[in-house]
Amino acid sequence: MEEDQLKLTLKRLSHELIENHYPFTNTCIIGIQPRGIAISDFITQYIQTIHPEVTISYGKLDITFYRDDFRGQIHIPSITDLPFSIEGKQVILIDDVLYTGRTIRAAMDALLDNGRAQKVELCILVDRKFSRELPIQPDYVGKSIDSIVTQKVKVVWGDEKRVILYDSI
């Protein structure tokens, strides 16, 4: 997926969130660190560009200490930045790629340590739908792909923005 298609997909996801959550008075958007931040930044900024009257509660969630592979790898924690209460709110978690579901499970654990949300929805840029190890399904999907275990999906968010599917062997 090249940059034009990627931006179009992110704008579509933004419009889906607007359709279901406008005016965002009881909704907060939370990006999962590290790779969900660029996507949640884009979506939040785009919504506020087309609806400047809207104030979105926006935060960033670090899941380092909630991962089930924490002891097996070296992870440098980031800072969780939730400058609002999620108590009774509708929360939209945003990440780049949904693969096994383990990152989302860790995000749910981290989120619940910050309060009890009324509802939690999941917004994903790329859904690798046949690789799930946990019963987790997204509510908003940018692109759904069929991939095998030896393939990887990488979201590049620098000067060139794109999604790459490649073989890892």
Task: Spell out what each predicted region is.
Residues 53-91:
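Short, glycine/charge-rich flexible loops or terminal/linker lids adjacent to PRPP-binding catalytic cores
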Residues 82-112:
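Internal catalytic-core helix/loop-beta-alpha segment
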Residues 109-169:
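PRPP-dependent phosphoribosyltransferase catalytic core
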Residues 24-45, 101:
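Charged, well-structured alpha/beta interaction segments
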Residues 14, 42-50, 110:
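Alpha-helical structural signal in soluble globular domains
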Residues 26, 57, 90, 119-122:
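Residues at the starts of beta-strands that form the adenosine-phosphate
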Residues 1-26:
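Active-site-facing substrate-recognition patch
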Residues 30-33, 61-66, 125-127:
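Short loop/turn motifs enriched for small/polar and acidic residues
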